[in-house]
Amino acid sequence: MGFELDRFDGDVDPDLKCALCHKVLEDPLTTPCGHVFCAGCVLPWVVQEGSCPARCRGRLSAKELNHVLPLKRLILKLDIKCAYATRGCGRVVKLQQLPEHLERCDFAPARCRHAGCGQVLLRRDVEAHMRDACDARPVGRCQEGCGLPLTHGEQRAGGHCCARALRAHNGALQARLGALHKALKKEALRAGKREKSLVAQLAAAQLELQMTALRYQKKFTEYSARLDSLSRCVAAPPGGKGEETKSLTLVLHRDSGSLGFNIIGGRPSVDNHDGSSSEGIFVSKIVDSGPAAKEGGLQIHDRIIEVNGRDLSRATHDQAVEAFKTAKEPIVVQVLRRTPRTKMFTPPSESQLVDTGTQTDITFEHIMALTKMSSPSPPVLDPYLLPEEHPSAHEYYDPNDYIGDIHQEMDREELELEEVDLYRMNSQDKLGLTVCYRTDDEDDIGIYISEIDPNSIAAKDGRIREGDRIIQINGIEVQNREEAVALLTSEENKNFSLLIARPELQLDEGWMDDDRNDFLDDLHMDMLEEQHHQAMQFTASVLQQKKHDEDGGTTDTATILSNQHEKDSGVGRTDESTRNDESSEQENNGDDATASSNPLAGQRKLTCSQDTLGSGDLPFSNESFISADCTDADYLGIPVDECERFRELLELKCQVKSATPYGLYYPSGPLDAGKSDPESVDKELELLNEELRSIELECLSIVRAHKMQQLKEQYRESWMLHNSGFRNYNTSIDVRRHELSDITELPEKSDKDSSSAYNTGESCRSTPLTLEISPDNSLRRAAEGISCPSSEGAVGTTEAYGPASKNLLSITEDPEVGTPTYSPSLKELDPNQPLESKERRASDGSRSPTPSQKLGSAYLPSYHHSPYKHAHIPAHAQHYQSYMQLIQQKSAVEYAQSQMSLVSMCKDLSSPTPSEPRMEWKVKIRSDGTRYITKRPVRDRLLRERALKIREERSGMTTDDDAVSEMKMGRYWSKEERKQHLVKAKEQRRRREFMMQSRLDCLKEQQAADDRKEMNILELSHKKMMKKRNKKIFDNWMTIQELLTHGTKSPDGTRVYNSFLSVTTV
């Protein structure tokens, strides 16, 4: 609405008037047709009518109206009277100054601020009124007892009613309290929303951190794979480059049956005649002070041509091992040794490393050692440390002779360039970049980033990664190390512009953004599944041991070799990682002696081989042993009393009845006797609590096994990483070596790419590898390794397993020497299963059937005398992850859960394993509205459709109430109703448990308060029977069993009645 015309001083131009309200324009708006109206007038009109008020055009919307600023400024310069002119104000001001005048005008209306006085006065008269004339002004406090303020009007009237005043005051306080409560609730609601928002942000940040960790782990895995290819070229240099080689003939003699060196290489198989440049048998390692390390002996990288006249130039790895094993002394070995090129070079006495904060020496051997570094387990990133020193065990060779055309191959890789700007506040701040470079005369003179300080400027920037190559610094192309050192250590520059290059990653990381929440859940479940697999491997070892005890004619090949010197293959056990650089053969003798004297503390040897994806990978050979000085009492960190307690608990609930093919539970003998012991009620209560606890553990284990089965089906492909390591074989007579070729290992879990149970480390400080427990090895498949009742009754037959069986790893333990060995996987036993490796696989001897009723009797004694029990860990054994992971099974509760889960699943294995369910992709919606894709069984959709179809059919069958009754047709329960039933059942079970616990607590309190002597069951029964001794023998509460057991006795023990009891059996 506009301004009134009579308020303006003087005449107003008609063009400044609104055509709707006929007043002076207030905030004028113009239409597209040129008419001008007040904003308060034209907006309601356009919204309601949808046209111009002048009816000059068609449809009009509010968006088409525009402000007329020049006209508005012209109107604001008009003189206008004060709005309170009627109250006595005679001021005339400019329209644009009117709001400021109204705020301080003395004639503006104002209300008295005293409570109870609502008089409206002029602003200039309010203060005088409140001070002198207001009847509601306070003049003191009531002296009659209420103590409330007394107003001037009440004092003039002679006082006030205290009760009425107190009630009014109380009502005012309650109203204020209610307002405060309401405000408090609003603030609490606002704070709760804020807290949820912050928690969500924190969770998102943690999730992003975990995803970043996984992303860098994948990148590190790719770098390790690329460096593996370099190390393979170093181990087997390509020919055809005109290297200088010379042929040498050496004579070796065994020292205690050992030659003291390792070999690698050989043709992949006997049938493969496509010779490649990497064929040949090479010396990979030489033991210090061994026969091969003497003067005039072998050297690393020597190629073995003949052994005692037997040509090994085109032999396989197994043929070379057999040749050294069967060779008679003296052993004449002909080798080809490469000599350095005749050119000038500077030996790398000291390699350079430049860091703007610290300086550390780093050599080419450190870079090559990165191929053996293990990546951290998700989601925790443990930084690895480069070793401080790495002594060279052989003379210097030109690296270009070994690497060959690797630089040209790397040049062909696609590079990703990125420019990074780093700023520091002063010259004392450190960039935190540790760069490394080669100091020998090679072609690659690049500068690489090897480490980033986590608290530095570069780490906070986040764009620079380890392994990046620095191309330019501040626009200057880096040509050599001197330029890089000068530019990075310059104190004048505070701004650094780095141009870095890195290979483009070929990994598809889109799945991580789409399904990262479910994938992180799978990480945790995968760790739990790994623990379950390890527990089930223990159970499998117990069953295999029991089978071996009962099958006298069957002998394990690994058992025959467990106490012989052929473990070192005649070539020598050259891995010093478990013996701290001591002689391998002497320790073998000591192990044999210990094993013969202490069967439970014998040698424990784990040997496995690996199939790699590359057919040109060279096989390595090595062995590792666990010391024989740890007995069964110091192997797993569980106290003796805890083991005994849970052993009894498992005997109570988890033992399998031998005569029952379905494996039903039944209580064992020792605890049955304890249950019937009448000496103490506390004993019965304790046994009852343990029984309830065991039932709860059983339920938890079944639920966990079911969840892991579902997760395994959903994320089958998500956790399988490419493994590009060496195939590793033992040079010992390990005939079980080929039976484990499908045991894969994750690159991030192995410090040396070797598939023996422990690493082929260059020193005893290296971290060993551990076996991968793949998500494909579900609990259901792992349970198939345990003999269950079937029509065949045998373990080794493929008919007992379905086609869904994939990779099953079982461990057997020899009862004489306690040597755990591996039995072959089902992939080898199944003739229909395709083999992915060219390596030949040996069969696993004869097998005998093991019935499932042996599970309970075999499990309990073995668990009691298990060699994996207490944590007295030798110092040299603490370096092995595979050893330590067995040690870390500290909780007997988890062990009991695994066993009970196994027993419960064995019931269903008598029938053939069903094939894998068909899956389909489903789009799911999270609570935050984001979408993700996951796999779901087709069976769920079919069942849902079938349920709907049944419901439709039944709803239209007939109108006869009797025909559609639940007694005849049954009732269909929907999914929601079934969920409600489960909730009710859980609530009822919880109430029953609570009532039982309350009753037991009440009994305990009554017994504690009762000072009389506790009577046993017999005395209570006698007392009950003799209450009515003179009336009748039987009462309503006596049973026939009580009468037969106790007779009719008085409390003093004398027999009162001797009635005749006749029992008729129908």
Swiss-Prot record:
<feature type="compositionally biased region" description="Polar residues">
    <location>
        <begin position="845"/>
        <end position="855"/>
    </location>
</feature>
<feature type="modified residue" description="Phosphoserine">
    <location>
        <position position="427"/>
    </location>
</feature>
<keyword id="KW-0808">Transferase</keyword>
<feature type="compositionally biased region" description="Basic and acidic residues">
    <location>
        <begin position="744"/>
        <end position="754"/>
    </location>
</feature>
<dbReference type="GO" id="GO:0005737">
    <property type="term" value="C:cytoplasm"/>
</dbReference>
<keyword id="KW-0597">Phosphoprotein</keyword>
<feature type="coiled-coil region">
    <location>
        <begin position="975"/>
        <end position="1025"/>
    </location>
</feature>
<comment type="subunit">
    <text>Interacts with NLGN1 and EFNB2. Interacts with UBE2D2 and with MUSK via the first PDZ domain.</text>
</comment>
<keyword id="KW-0479">Metal-binding</keyword>
<comment type="pathway">
    <text>Protein modification; protein ubiquitination.</text>
</comment>
<dbReference type="Pfam" id="PF13923">
    <property type="entry name" value="zf-C3HC4_2"/>
</dbReference>
<dbReference type="GO" id="GO:0008270">
    <property type="term" value="F:zinc ion binding"/>
</dbReference>
<dbReference type="InterPro" id="IPR001478">
    <property type="entry name" value="PDZ"/>
</dbReference>
<dbReference type="InterPro" id="IPR036034">
    <property type="entry name" value="PDZ_sf"/>
</dbReference>
<feature type="domain" description="PDZ 2">
    <location>
        <begin position="419"/>
        <end position="503"/>
    </location>
</feature>
<feature type="zinc finger region" description="TRAF-type">
    <location>
        <begin position="100"/>
        <end position="158"/>
    </location>
</feature>
<dbReference type="GO" id="GO:0007528">
    <property type="term" value="P:neuromuscular junction development"/>
</dbReference>
<dbReference type="InterPro" id="IPR001841">
    <property type="entry name" value="Znf_RING"/>
</dbReference>
<dbReference type="InterPro" id="IPR001293">
    <property type="entry name" value="Znf_TRAF"/>
</dbReference>
<comment type="function">
    <text>E3 ubiquitin-protein ligase. Plays an important role in regulating the surface level of MUSK on myotubes. Mediates the ubiquitination of MUSK, promoting its endocytosis and lysosomal degradation. Might contribute to terminal myogenic differentiation.</text>
</comment>
<keyword id="KW-0963">Cytoplasm</keyword>
<feature type="coiled-coil region">
    <location>
        <begin position="679"/>
        <end position="704"/>
    </location>
</feature>
<dbReference type="InterPro" id="IPR051971">
    <property type="entry name" value="E3_ubiquitin-PDZ_ligase"/>
</dbReference>
<feature type="compositionally biased region" description="Polar residues">
    <location>
        <begin position="755"/>
        <end position="769"/>
    </location>
</feature>
<dbReference type="GO" id="GO:0061630">
    <property type="term" value="F:ubiquitin protein ligase activity"/>
</dbReference>
<feature type="region of interest" description="Disordered">
    <location>
        <begin position="808"/>
        <end position="863"/>
    </location>
</feature>
<dbReference type="GO" id="GO:0016567">
    <property type="term" value="P:protein ubiquitination"/>
</dbReference>
<keyword id="KW-0863">Zinc-finger</keyword>
<feature type="compositionally biased region" description="Polar residues">
    <location>
        <begin position="554"/>
        <end position="563"/>
    </location>
</feature>
<keyword id="KW-0677">Repeat</keyword>
<dbReference type="Pfam" id="PF00595">
    <property type="entry name" value="PDZ"/>
</dbReference>
<keyword id="KW-0833">Ubl conjugation pathway</keyword>
<keyword id="KW-0862">Zinc</keyword>
<feature type="compositionally biased region" description="Basic and acidic residues">
    <location>
        <begin position="564"/>
        <end position="582"/>
    </location>
</feature>
<protein>
    <recommendedName>
        <fullName>E3 ubiquitin-protein ligase PDZRN3</fullName>
        <ecNumber>2.3.2.27</ecNumber>
    </recommendedName>
</protein>
<keyword id="KW-0175">Coiled coil</keyword>
<feature type="zinc finger region" description="RING-type; degenerate">
    <location>
        <begin position="18"/>
        <end position="56"/>
    </location>
</feature>
<dbReference type="GO" id="GO:0031594">
    <property type="term" value="C:neuromuscular junction"/>
</dbReference>
<keyword id="KW-0832">Ubl conjugation</keyword>
<feature type="compositionally biased region" description="Polar residues">
    <location>
        <begin position="594"/>
        <end position="603"/>
    </location>
</feature>
<feature type="region of interest" description="Disordered">
    <location>
        <begin position="744"/>
        <end position="778"/>
    </location>
</feature>
<dbReference type="InterPro" id="IPR017907">
    <property type="entry name" value="Znf_RING_CS"/>
</dbReference>
